[in-house]
Every structure is written in structure tokens, then in C-alpha cells.
A protein has these predicted regions:
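Alpha-helical transmembrane segments and immediately membrane-proximal extracytoplasmic
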Residues: 1-211
């Protein structure tokens, strides 16, 4: 992706990026909680698989008609590209994608969580960047990587992802974002089977499953 507005490494830029990453950590916790809550509630109130899928389909169609766009159906790659390369995203896009994803996946439709996570991170970062004095395009890139790091608890993989998607320019800044998001996202994760072996805040072996 061709992103713009990568700042020089300085105390100001590090502070701005740390603030955005901290916000992304909060959003990552919220995403994990929404996914877990919706999964348990759909299983509880709609135990029949076929009925659950039917209800989910009707709800998604209704929501799509309500918002007046299909941007939140499917992977949403066009929206991700617009946020990264044009610095454009609707302020509510990240929340709507979170809602659409939770309903779609947890009512039984097949699909992954990772690309929707990219969507949520990129659109949130693009929107929040302006409040922190960052370029929206660069903010979208930071948001994508930081949110991904928060939900998968894999900082090294997230740094490598930033290099793969955006090249080596600003790699230290992406590393800062990943570090902050990882530290502040707690022990939440998209996958409850994930084992977190060590504490994020102290040198302690904990061996717990992600929440």
C-alpha cells in the first residue's frame, strides 16, 4: 500500500502514535468482547443452527438496507484501500463493521475475522488520526497494525506485517504502536484457544487462555 504522511522519528511523533495505539488497544478489547458476547447470546437464544443462520441473514439484509451501502458486507477491501491510500473513512465505519462482523460470523456464516479486523483498524485509525495530529493515511496504517496486534497478541508478527504491507519506512514507529497495543490490550483475543504463556507486565509465567 502507498501510504502518506509518515512522520520523522521524534518524541512528538512517538507520543502521537502511542496515543493512537492505546486507543486501538481499547477497540481491540471491545471487538473481542463483542464477538464473545454475540456468540454466546446467539447460541443461547437461537440454538437451532438453521434458524440462527436464517435470522442472521435477515438481520444483515435489514442492516444493509438501513445504512444504504454494501461497504460492510464481505471483506471490505475497497474501504481499507480508501482509508490507507486516500485517508478517507466514515467516522462510524469501524463500529458498523464490528456489528456486521459479529452478527455474520456468530450466526453461522463462514468467514474470517482477520480482514474485518484490518477494516476496523484502518477506518478507526484514519478517523482518530486527525484528532492526534497525524496524517489520516498513516493513521489508518497504524490502526490496522495496532488493532491486529491487540486481537491476536502477536507483536513480532504484527511488526513483520507492517513491513510486508507498508515497507520499511517508519518501521520503528509501527513497532512502537505494536508494543503499546500489545501491552494495553490485556489478555483478550479473538481465539479463546490461544495460550498466553507469559505476563505482559511482569516476568511471570502464567499459561492462560485468551479471554
Amino acid at each position: 500500500f502507498n501510504i502518506t504522511g509518515i512522520p520523522r522519528l521524534s518524541l512528538v511523533s512517538v507520543t502521537q502514535i502511542a496515543a493512537l495505539a492505546a486507543l486501538c488497544a481499547v477497540i481491540s478489547i471491545l471487538l473481542c468482547m463483542v464477538m464473545e458476547f454475540s456468540h454466546s447470546r446467539f447460541q443461547m437464544y437461537l440454538p437451532n443452527t438453521y434458524l440462527r443462520i436464517a435470522v442472521g441473514g435477515v438481520v444483515i439484509i435489514a442492516l444493509t438496507l438501513l445504512v444504504g451501502t454494501r461497504d460492510y458486507n464481505g471483506a471490505g477491501v475497497d474501504v481499507i484501500v480508501a482509508a490507507l491510500e486516500k485517508g478517507k473513512a466514515h467516522p462510524e465505519a469501524f463500529a458498523l463493521k464490528m456489528l456486521f462482523t459479529a452478527i455474520t460470523i456468530n450466526t453461522g456464516f463462514k468467514g474470517g475475522e482477520i480482514v474485518p479486523t484490518f477494516f476496523i483498524g484502518a477506518t478507526f485509525g484514519c478517523t482518530a488520526a486527525g484528532f492526534l495530529g497525524l496524517d489520516p493515511s498513516f493513521g489508518a496504517a497504524i490502526g490496522l497494525v495496532a488493532l491486529f496486534c491487540g486481537v491476536v497478541n502477536c507483536p513480532v508478527a504484527s511488526i513483520l506485517l507492517s513491513y510486508e504491507l507498508f515497507g520499511g519506512s517508519g518501521l520503528v514507529l509501527f513497532a512502537v504502536a505494536c508494543g503499546v497495543s500489545y501491552m494495553l490490550s490485556g489478555y483478550y483475543g479473538l481465539y479463546s484457544s490461544q495460550k498466553i504463556m507469559y505476563s505482559k507486565t511482569k516476568p511471570e509465567y502464567i499459561n492462560i487462555n485468551a479471554k
